[in-house]
Structure formats: C-alpha cells, structure tokens
C-alpha cells in the first residue's frame, strides 16, 4: 500500500512537469528550508562517457570503455535492423557534475510469434547523497514510448524497491533466485566456505583439506557429472564467429514452436552480445548435433575475476530442441569439462524454466539463494503485462537483459 501511494505521488509529480523539456530541475531543501542543490535530469550523450564511467567506478561498477558504448548504442542489432531507439539513458547533474546514471539498452524479443522492442536497464548508480532522486531516472526509463517491454535483470534489493514502486513486477519464474552449482575445485571451495563462516589462518588451511575429502565423498550422491555423450549425439566446441545457416535454421525452428517470451537469437546477435571490446570474460560455445542436425547449444562464460576468492563459469545461454534431457546432459557435461579446464572453481546455472532445471536436478547440483529475485519487468500494454505475469510465459536466463552484456 505504501509503495503504491509513493508510486502515485512520484507519477503525479513528474507528469506535472513539462515532458517536452529535456531537462528537469529539482531543488533539495536543507533542514532550515534553504535550497542547497539543484539537480537536473537529462539524456546522456557519448561525450558524457568519461565522467559517467569515473562515477560508476567510484560506486563499484565494473570497467567500461567508449568502444563498448559504441557497441551498445551504435552497433546494436536492435538499433540497426529493428528500428529501436538509440537512447543511451539518463543522468542526474548537480551544478554541472554528474551524480547519477541509468542506461537503457534496446533489445529484440519475441512472444507468441510477434516481435517486441524491449529495453534493459544498465549501470544504475547514484551517489549516496543524491539517492532521493533515483526514482527520476527510473521514471524516465519507463516513459520511453517506443518500448513495449522494460526489463531490469540485475536489480539490487534497493533498486528492486524503486522498480516495484514504479509498478514493475518481479519475474514470476519462481526459482530464478535459486542458483544451482557444481563444485569443480573442492579444496578452494572449502576454503571459501570456511572464510564465509568467519574462520581464518590455520583453521582454514586444515579445514579445506577435510572439506575436500567430504566433497569428494559427497560426489557419490551430489555434484555429479553426466556420462559422456551417447553415440547418437555429437557435441562440438565452436567459435561464435563460425555460426551460420545451421544455427539460423535451429533458432528459427525453436522460435516458431515457442510460446514463451524469448530474447532474439541469431549468429549476428550472439556475436554482438558476447564479444564485447576489451572482454575479460571469454565464452565457449558448445553445439549439439543429432543425425547431423543442430539440436541445441550452450554458451559458457568464464569470470576470470574472483568473487570472494572463487573463480566462476556461468551458463550464460542454453537452448535445446523440445527441452530434450539427453541433449541438456550432453551439453552440461561439455560445460563442466571446459569450466574445469579453464580453472573455474564452480559452475553456476541461473534461471531457465523448470523443464530445463529438472533435467539438471538429475545430476544433483548444490544450490544457494540470492537475497532477492533481481529480475523485474513491465510491459507498456496491459494485455502483454497480464500475459507475462504467468510463469509459463518466461524463458528467463542470464542471456536476458544486461546480465551477460558487460565485458
């Protein structure tokens, strides 16, 4: 109720302003009622990159480059071939200094055979003393009249509250916040788990040896790997640049049969999506063939930077004909082998519909939960929004939104 009242108040305030203006000024009174700041909202431009990048770095966002901005907002297939808007996003300024930013990446989607123009949030960051104005960026994002579907696939709990106040909804895919994972390096994972428990020094050194033995014993029942592919299936490790007609035929077949919302896939889009300038997170593409016909593929992304002492490989995309469990198993086996070869300590699977997850449950992965579901959506038209409130309407995974777009 409070969130709804807040949302209405925000909307009323914004609509009262002149929407034709590209700048919106808001004054902040101090405790004695004096105006101490004048915050302006405007669209971001390419020349704003250095200051926005510096601010994002200060606030804990990852590295970026002007070349990557050109990739996202000039070379984007949704802009070049889908007539999507090339709007970078919005920023907050105080006395000419940038104090907040929210990007908007145009993307192509399909739902029940109809194409959709979507936009994904990215790099949402506001300096602490200006976070009372964060909602201005979010409301500007949702005011894009050319956009049919709005997505935030990587919302923090704080950002999620702002999205909810703007009447965006949490993804109805109930298991999205539950991450499945396989331990590939038991000793390093044991040390990580012990540090999370607050142990240090000798206790960690001794505990990781015991933990390794426990995890190796547990692998008889948990953390299992599928067997090698059957004779009828062939799994290949192929470069993204090699995809051609066979891939287009495969995704077209899936698209025509699919009743779920699906981010557009093509050889051009996958190459654009995963091959960012100065990419620190290399990908491996595995394709699966049955009787010479492509029947599925998996994209594995390796995160070279460690997260709390762990190196991760993540299943960034997975599409399989008829959700065939034998194809899922063959691709999972290839992904696990490649992740271990690359030096990953764990392999993670985030999202995907229950039919795919049920195929993965056969191999008894471990699981952990995020503090909250990070995926929010909002459709411009009521009919589409209502349809997307059903879990069966989604095929959400890290390929959606901006989750795997950054270098």
Show where each model-derived region lies.
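Active-site/acyl-donor-binding loops of N-acyltransferases
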Residues: 2, 6, 11-18, 33, ...
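Internal, well-ordered domain-core segments that constitute the primary functional module
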Residues: 100, 106-110, 115-180
């Amino acid at each position: 109720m409070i969130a709804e009242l807040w949302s209405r108040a925000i909307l009323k305030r914004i609509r009262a302003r002149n929407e034709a203006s590209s700048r919106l000024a808001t004054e902040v009174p101090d405790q004695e009622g004096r105006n101490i700041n004048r915050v302006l909202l405007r669209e971001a431009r390419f020349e704003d990159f250095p200051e926005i990048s510096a601010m994002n770095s200060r606030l804990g966002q990852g590295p970026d480059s002007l070349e990557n901005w050109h990739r996202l907002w000039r070379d984007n297939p949704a802009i070049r071939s889908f007539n999507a808007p090339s709007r970078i996003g919005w920023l907050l300024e105080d006395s000419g200094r940038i104090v907040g930013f929210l990007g908007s990446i145009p993307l192509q989607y399909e739902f029940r055979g109809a194409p959709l123009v979507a936009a994904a949030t990215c790099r949402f960051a506001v300096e602490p003393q200006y976070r009372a104005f964060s909602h201005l960026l979010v409301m500007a994002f949702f005011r894009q009249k050319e956009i049919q579907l709005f997505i935030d696939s990587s919302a923090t709990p704080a950002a999620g509250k702002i999205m909810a106040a703007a009447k965006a909804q949490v993804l109805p895919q109930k298991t999205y916040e539950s991450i499945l994972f396989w331990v590939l390096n038991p000793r390093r994972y044991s040390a990580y788990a012990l540090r999370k428990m607050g142990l240090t020094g000798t206790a960690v050194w001794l505990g990781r040896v015991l933990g390794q033995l426990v995890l190796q014993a547990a692998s008889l029942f948990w953390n299992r790997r599928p067997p090698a592919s059957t004779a009828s299936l062939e799994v290949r490790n192929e470069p993204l640049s090699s995809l051609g007609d066979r891939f287009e035929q495969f995704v077209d077949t899936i698209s025509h049969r699919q009743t779920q919302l699906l981010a557009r896939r093509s050889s051009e889009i996958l190459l654009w999506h995963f091959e960012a300038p100065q990419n620190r997170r290399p990908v491996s593409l595995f394709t699966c063939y049955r009787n010479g016909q492509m029947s599925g593929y998996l994209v594995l992304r390796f995160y070279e930077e460690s997260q709390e002492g762990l190196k991760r490989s993540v299943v960034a995309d997975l599409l399989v004909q008829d959700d065939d469990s034998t194809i899922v198993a063959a691709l999972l086996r290839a992904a696990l082998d490649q992740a271990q070869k690359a030096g990953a300590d764990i392999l993670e699977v985030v999202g995907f519909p229950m039919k795919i997850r049920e195929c993965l449950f056969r191999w008894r992965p471990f699981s952990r939960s995020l503090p909250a579901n990070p995926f929010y959506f909002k459709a411009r038209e009521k009919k589409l929004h209502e349809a997307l409130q059903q879990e069966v309407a989604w095929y959400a995974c890290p390929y959606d939104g901006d989750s795997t777009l950054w270098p």
